[in-house]
Amino acid sequence: MTETKPNRHVKTVCTLGPASSSPEIIRKLLSGGMDISRLNLNYGTLEEHSQLIKIVRSVSQDLKLTTGILLDLPGSKRRTGDIKAVFADHLEFAVSHQADFIALSFISSAQQVKEVRRLLTEMKSDIPIIVKIERAKSLEAS
């Protein structure tokens, strides 16, 4: 991702949703300093998110700014079982839309993050993963 503001080491992340999905609002957010657009895939449809990504990229291009796309993957608070079954469609969406970052919440072990990385590698993607640590147990090595 290209630096959008010289000498800035902090990035402003804005969560976009129904109230902030118009080109006009996105233009205001970008002009106000938004560096990364966060889309929470827990809400809305993949088609709605696809359209929003197109709008963000179009407005960013008009303003000659580079804006990152962060896709926050949905997940249950009690994540167990097959990671591939939980994330496959959303990871494919992230890869096909060239997301700049993927966020994971409610991860219960380092192994789950490794599995997501393995799935991304299979898809020939190296999208950075941001993990939200909910419990101390999640930090334990697997």
What is each stretch, according to the model?
Residues 1-142:
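Non-catalytic helical/linker scaffolds that mediate oligomerization, partner binding
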